[in-house]
Amino acid sequence: MASQVSPGVILRERDLTNVTIVGSSTLTAALASSFQKGPIGEVTPISSLKDLVETFGTPSESNAEDWLVASEFLGYGGRLAVVRAETSVLNATSDGTAVLVRNESDYQSGVGSAEAFVARTAGTWGNSLKVVAVDRGADQILTLASAPATTTANTAFTTVGGKAGRIYSFDSATNELAVILENPGSLITSTDVFDEPGDGIVSAVTFAAYTGVGSQNGSHTSSPSGGTGSGLQVQAIIDVNGVVTSVTVQAGGTGYTQGDVVTVPAADLGTGASADLSVTIGTVSNDNIAISSVKDWYTNTKITGTELTLGAIGPRPGTSVYASSRGISYDEIHIAVIDTTGDVSGAASTVLERITYLSKMTDAKSAEGASLYFKDIVNLQSEFIYTSGTLTGLVEPTAAGGAEAFGQASTAFTTGDKFLLAALNESTLSGGVDDYSYTPGEVNAAMDLFADTEATETNFILMGGSMGSESDTLAKAQKCVAVAALRKD
């Protein structure tokens, strides 16, 4: 807008805030500060405000002055060399035992390697993350007519028709039992009958006539041998004449059949006993449970705390071509990172990243010869996490058991081997800590990284904002001057 206030004199109003300095894209300024996230103790090149936000997060009240200086320089077309100062920040981890992983080199040296998952950089932002590891997992979810007595994960079971597998999980509110089948090609239907684990529990016995000697008088507890089951414990009462008057069940065991004959050894029948006692299994419980309905586990299982099903990560993993060619099964695994709170993405339950069709085998390769091992790929490609420790809560894929642990090379396997299953393995990260208030020593240590002219090219040293006291501000300013003088460029 222009106005003429006197003859021949014109005033023009011009916005200079968006002026771009010619040649500014070749100018680089150095800045050290505290940030919401990002690597600590290393120089990071930044070319735009978008780049700054993606790498170091959004500004806070505590670092607003430094942030303004950075954004203004970038706004005029310049570039930045940024160092995040090391303050009392910590990385969030899968078990909540926070550690400080300064940068990728720090992690590669072993810092944080005991954790299954660690947030890529320090700060409370990592407390929003949930890491989901999922493989082929369970096969089906059975809705049972009643709750089985045994619902412990990894417990072997069969149907009355002989379909075998292991229990993965049980929801007592709905009587839904997730199961892993030994033969996934033969699915359970609602016409099958669930043969409850723990069948053959003894509740009553009879015993053969027995007369010993008076010194056997008393109560004697024994775990008899024989029969089709195990775990039975009985108590025999012998009177003053050495006669067995009763035998009662103390622990029913499992797997017994009515009519089984078991033996209480003489050694368990008191002083002077010379004969064994014969006991017959009289009553056992064999509760079979009707199956009301059946559905697929993978497509109907939700990630805890979200409405996302596992299908939001990717199709069900199975066995890679590499493993299959060696007779090995169930090596594939997906890894996904979920924003549980929305603090990272702006929307809760957002899938921040998904890395699919990885392998549990250390030497697995793609068709192009690249590594497929899940730890290698996650540590190389993920923007949000590192992984190194061991996943817990793994389950057997077959009733026979004996599946193999993650993290082995193919040479450790024989044809027919299977990997243990992670199924749905969730890790909510916690323990991350922010600290925006840096001391002169902390920010000065960060500025020292700009002193090497060979490692960092810069045209300016930006002081940023003032500190909490005049003396601290002066110390910060003097450090900027000292670094500039040392560089002499």
Regions found by a protein language model. Give the residues of each.
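Short, glycine-/Ser/Thr-/acidic-enriched flexible segments
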Residues: 122, 254, 269, 342, ...
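Conserved, function-critical positions that sit in or immediately flank catalytic
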Residues: 149-292
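Short loop/turn motifs at secondary-structure junctions
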Residues: 201, 243, 329, 455-457
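Residues embedded in well-ordered beta-strands within globular domains across many folds
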Residues: 248, 378, 461-462
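A glycine-rich, acidic short-motif signal
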Residues: 336-338, 355-361, 421-489
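E2/UBC-UEV (E2-variant) core
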Residues: 347-397
